[in-house]
Amino acid sequence: MKKNYLYAISTILIWATMAASVKKMLFDIPNLEALSISSFLGFLFLLIWNIKTGMIKEIKSYSMKDYGIISGLGFIGLFLYSALYYYGLAQLSSQEACILNYLWPIMLVIFSCIILKEKMTPVKLLAMLCSFVGIIILSSGGGNLADGNKIMGIISCIVAAACYGLFSVLNKKADYDQRLSMMVIWLVVGVCALVMGLLTETWVPIRGVQWIGMIWLGVVIDAVAYLLWALALKGSENTAVIANMAYLTPFLSLIISAIFLKEKIEARAVIALIFIVGGILLQNLFGQKSE
């Protein structure tokens, strides 16, 4: 098997653990505390990586304007996204939050049409319709919709997906070296989460096995998986095939949540996921041909 496929598979397996890992941590640790500590760990790992590889020298070539843009990207794309997603995870089951999180590629299509002036085609509209049908199916059971926490959890996950979709479009326009920009972005996320967390939460000491969870989230999921994914795409002869493999992640995430959190895999969740991911794949496979 080619190395890029091994990198891609490794990344997908790591990403699939995110919902269950965060959900388990949020049982005992406030949302923004978990986000702040894991983000600083991700920043430190990427800092060491960039120093070791010599990439850190390139940071001098960036102007204050560049750092302002990168910081803005970090605030919108990963601080707001993560804070909202963590809140959604705390209110919903991990499978519900994970599925709603995968609306971000559809949000990317919407923002690409608005910001990049890409053409809205019938295929894109059909893809959006499929994904929003998935939202309706997912929201139609698994608890009382009159429950304000559930409604807020659903809204938070949808807005989080919109933030990440917007980030993906703006990041594409910015075109910075991702190893350096992600290092700065995780620092920004850590600082924002630290400030907001200290103002709004009562933080608790991190003990024993909780540090393993923090390291897994901050270093492995936030940093290592990103680097592996970049290597997978860089070494691929067919980037589209590798990119589409990422949509296995939510399906694997359902299985991992069922094993480690004892969450029952509900039929409506699977059907909703098929609609949402089906809409994304429809756009990816046929969207370009229709333009």
Where are these regions (language model features)?
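Helix-helix packing/entry segments at the starts of transmembrane helices
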Residues: 35-37, 96-103, 171-190, 222-259
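Specific transmembrane alpha-helical segments of multi-pass solute transporters/efflux pumps
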Residues: 18-19, 47, 53-95, 137, ...
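Loop-to-transmembrane-helix transition segments
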Residues: 3-13, 57-84, 152-160, 205-224, ...
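Glycine-/small-residue-enriched transmembrane alpha-helix faces in small-molecule transporters
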Residues: 1-38, 144-173, 189-195, 256, ...
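Hydrophobic transmembrane alpha-helices of multi-pass small-molecule transport proteins
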Residues: 46, 111, 120-142, 160-161, ...
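C-terminal transmembrane-helix exit sites in multi-pass transporters
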Residues: 45, 50, 104-129, 250-270
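Hydrophobic/aromatic residues within transmembrane alpha-helices
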Residues: 25, 34, 38, 88, ...
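Hydrophobic/small/kink-forming positions within alpha-helical transmembrane segments
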Residues: 13-16, 20, 74-79, 83, ...
